[in-house]
Amino acid sequence: TNLKDARPELYGKLEAENKPEKALVQEGDMYSFHAVDRMFKEQEWICPINIEHQDNAFYSISRNQITIPEKAQFKDGESWYGTAFHEMVHSTGAEGQLNRLKPQSGFGSDEYAREELVAELGSALVCQKYGMTKNLKEDSAAYLKSWLGSLKESPSFIKTTLMDVKKATSILTQRIDEVSLEMKEQQSEDVAASVSEENKDAKDMKQSASSNDNEQT
């Protein structure tokens, strides 16, 4: 069973609250999400994000930092952003944030499995919100199914997990939306400044032409 089959009403509620909005721009064979790209470049997330040419994506609890491979190592931009969102959801559980992570929880433990569910479902929902659904739904479904198989499903477990997913994705989407709004406002200011400069140039040219006419004999 997967999460959608186990509690369809709760899954449906989360989906309804995360209606897709197109944020990707296709650039060649890759997709780009400019707000998230700026967050990475300017280090505007709650912890440092290192992009390196290597094969692993992970969040280090002890160092409170994320490491992800380069975008070019992925088949498309959607998969890369989905991987980044997975690790960013992990980072929301750090001490001083949502205090969800337990450093002593080793691979294979119930706590580890539950955190992977939070991160992967959170990633899938963030991707869905911004219109990235095609590739990630299949990957996420397989991921969620494998981890749910290692846990005893119960209504309380599913409910508390979804609550953590909602809290984590709220932090992530709120920051993305803030950066996106800042970029739009800056773009509007740039356009307004450009129009103002063009109007000034036109006015100067008109005044110059008028002066020349007055000087003619």
Question: What is the role of each PLM region?
Answer:
Residues 1-75:
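Contiguous, non-catalytic segments that form substrate-binding/exosite surfaces or channel walls
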Residues 66-72, 101-108, 147, 151:
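Glycine- and acidic
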Residues 77-81, 115:
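Alpha-helical scaffolds flanking conserved acidic
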Residues 82-95, 119:
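Active-site recognition of the HExxH zinc-binding catalytic motif
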Residues 92-117, 138-144:
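Post-HEXXH active-site segment of zinc metalloproteases
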Residues 111, 124-191:
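Long, well-structured alpha-helical subdomains associated
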Residues 116-126:
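Hydrophobic/aromatic-rich, well-ordered segments within soluble, folded domains that form packed cores
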Residues 192-193, 197-198, 203-217:
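Non-Sec secretion/translocation targeting segments of pathogen effectors
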